[in-house]
Amino acid sequence: VSGNRVAKTRVTIHASPDEVWNALTRPELVKKYMMGADVKSDWKVGSPLTYTGEYKGKRYEEKGVIKKIEPHKLLQTTHFSTTSGKEDTPENHALVTWELHPKGDATVVAVSQAGIETEKGVEGSQANWNGVLEGLKKTVEGAAS
């Protein structure tokens, strides 16, 4: 992780942490809100995690390693995108943390991405994560209704 800036965003989803967790870890649900990406992992600490797909006509791969996992509560991974234009070295991998907090009959989902080098990078990352969280919310709330 080379940068010291962090992008953070959150959303409240009207569903249980279990339902949200399923949407984070089940490939057929991830595909609905993560720009059509195919996710692969066995969801264990130390295991690889990859998202592959096509964006604006170009193939991409985003990858990382699971650092921490507490089902229905926390998922922390490293993250590297082949579209970043950077070399695939550990210092160019960001750290992404998903936290699920029950709140009544809803779940607050907080996402942070650490290791960003510029304020412009923070803004771009937050916009990206806001879009992902909106899609996650629609996917989960649509499935729950």
Language-model-detected regions and their locations in the chain:
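Extracellular beta-rich ligand/substrate-recognition surface
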Residues: V1-N4, T52, K56
